[in-house]
Amino acid sequence: MSSPSKRREMDMMKLMMSDYKVETINDGMQEFYVEFNGPKDSLYQGGVWKIRVELPDAYPYKSPSVGFITKIYHPNVDELSGSVCLDVINQTWSPMFDLVNVFETFLPQLLLYPNPSDPLNGEAAALMMRDRPAYEQRVKEYCEKYAKPGEGSEDKSSDEELSEEEYGSDNEDDDDDDVAIAGKPDP
């Protein structure tokens, strides 16, 4: 067994033995989901996100690919794909880091300290810089709608969109049961 594959297995086992819920895809160690809780003292506290992680063949010498499956409102996360703009993972990754670092350090730092000057979600970045209270309210709305603990995050995919009513309406008569699910036909 080569060194990168041994390291991949060791890092996966370390992650699985931590407090994170890990679900492998296709019974392999190359792709998996991790349940990630929003960091304390952040706008995301109390939210739970499903994160997809893909390990390249050259892991740990090449960084893992990380993306939010559960929809999140953040300047550095693409709202449609869930892709994360995270320099530490994408550009400054080192083989000294492991998978637990991604979930205990890198993602919490991203959520605690968004960078609106290097956005993947331009609308979130603009709102954050222009109207901080409105931005914070939108983050909380997304957390309440999509990142509730204990609910199936498959129904809250990053490529799902809010309807016009859900996105910006003050109409309290809206029926929240009519949530569109990405990849499924409308009834």
From Swiss-Prot:
Transmembrane segments: none
Induction notes from the record: Not induced by heat shock.
Keywords linked to the UniProt accession: ATP-binding, Nucleotide-binding, Transferase, Ubl conjugation pathway
Family: Belongs to the ubiquitin-conjugating enzyme family.
Any GO BP annotation: ubiquitin-dependent protein catabolic process
Role played: Accepts the ubiquitin from the E1 complex and catalyzes its covalent attachment to other proteins.
Chain spans, region Disordered: 145-187
CDD domains: UBCc_UBE2H
The protein's name: Ubiquitin-conjugating enzyme E2 4
Catalytic residues identified in the record: C85
Pfam families on file: UQ_con (PF00179)
UBC core domain location: 1-148
PANTHER family found in the cross-reference section: UBIQUITIN-CONJUGATING ENZYME E2
Top-tier EC class: transferase
Annotated GO MF terms: ATP binding; ubiquitin conjugating enzyme activity; ubiquitin-protein transferase activity
Record's keyword annotation contains Transferase: yes
Entry EC number(s): 2.3.2.23
Pathway listed: Protein modification; protein ubiquitination
Catalytic reaction annotation: S-ubiquitinyl-[E1 ubiquitin-activating enzyme]-L-cysteine + [E2 ubiquitin-conjugating enzyme]-L-cysteine = [E1 ubiquitin-activating enzyme]-L-cysteine + S-ubiquitinyl-[E2 ubiquitin-conjugating enzyme]-L-cysteine
Biased composition (Basic and acidic residues): 145-156
Extent of Acidic residues compositional bias: 157-179
InterPro entries according to UniProt: UBQ-conjugat_E2_core, UBQ-conjugating_AS, UBQ-conjugating_enzyme/RWD
Key word GTP-binding present: no
